[in-house]
């Protein structure tokens, strides 16, 4: 698709450049706006897929520059990890129809970044600080991400962290009321298996606690701590059982941990104590992370 010119819903012209990578739903390319030097990425997927529709709806809900600026000022922070959203659109190529979304271009995902960092703790603390504020903001809109994993957390050139890929979000607040806990077998193990929360394994709507639990598993990965359930490969049921056992052992203090990693397990213990509808104490979680 390289070289194809596109026009977004705002009438701005873009051109698809080099392929960056492909996933289960589509491909990501570099791109540049024709009217300025703005660099961006363009995600392209078949019109038959619906994940991009979900993502655009999320950005329409949460991406408002003025609202974000007010929220950052209220929280006394200078960064919120939501990528800049430039627009979206659709196009036809040969006999196929496609959707696209235009987003801020970031540098690297945290899975790759942490592979080459010799002393990861300071970076993990910064990533967690950014992500806890980002999730708090998203959760205030009644939305859970549902696919928190190192590949979906990226950094820019200043090592500020961003949460990407809002294709399988859930709305846990509907008409002002929190959804009830309800299991659906068609949604078992939703998300990325190794990082899915227990709620995601059970097929229920992921809520605030599920996102925060998945973020805890990311911390284990970033710190170089093996995920105990990885030995079960893609067996979703066995991974689920292993996570349940792991969390029970964490709560009973039966996990062998180095003192330097105690803060990670304290965080996991805290978020897995939350009830399904409970609003987390994000400030407390930030304090736990600061103790790493």
Swiss-Prot record:
Signal peptide range: none
Entry-linked SUPFAM superfamilies: Protein kinase-like (PK-like)
Binding site for ATP: 20-28, 43
Organism placement in taxonomy: Viruses, Varidnaviria, Bamfordvirae, Nucleocytoviricota, Pokkesviricetes
Keywords: ATP-binding, Kinase, Nucleotide-binding, Serine/threonine-protein kinase, Transferase
Gene3D superfamilies, per the entry: Transferase(Phosphotransferase) domain 1
Protein EC: 2.7.11.1
PANTHER family (alphabetical): CASEIN KINASE-RELATED
Entry keyword rRNA processing: no
Keyword tRNA processing on entry: no
One MF term in the entry's GO annotations: protein serine/threonine kinase activity
Name the UniProt record assigns to this protein: Probable serine/threonine-protein kinase FPV226
Pfam family, one: Pkinase
Catalytically driven reaction(s): L-seryl-[protein] + ATP = O-phospho-L-seryl-[protein] + ADP + H(+); L-threonyl-[protein] + ATP = O-phospho-L-threonyl-[protein] + ADP + H(+)
Enzyme class: transferase
Domain Protein kinase: 14-292
Source organism, top-level taxon: Viruses
Species annotation: Fowlpox virus (strain NVSL) (FPV)
Transmembrane annotation, as ranges: none
Residues forming the catalytic site: 147 (proton acceptor)
Entry similarity comment: Belongs to the protein kinase superfamily. Ser/Thr protein kinase family. Poxviruses subfamily.
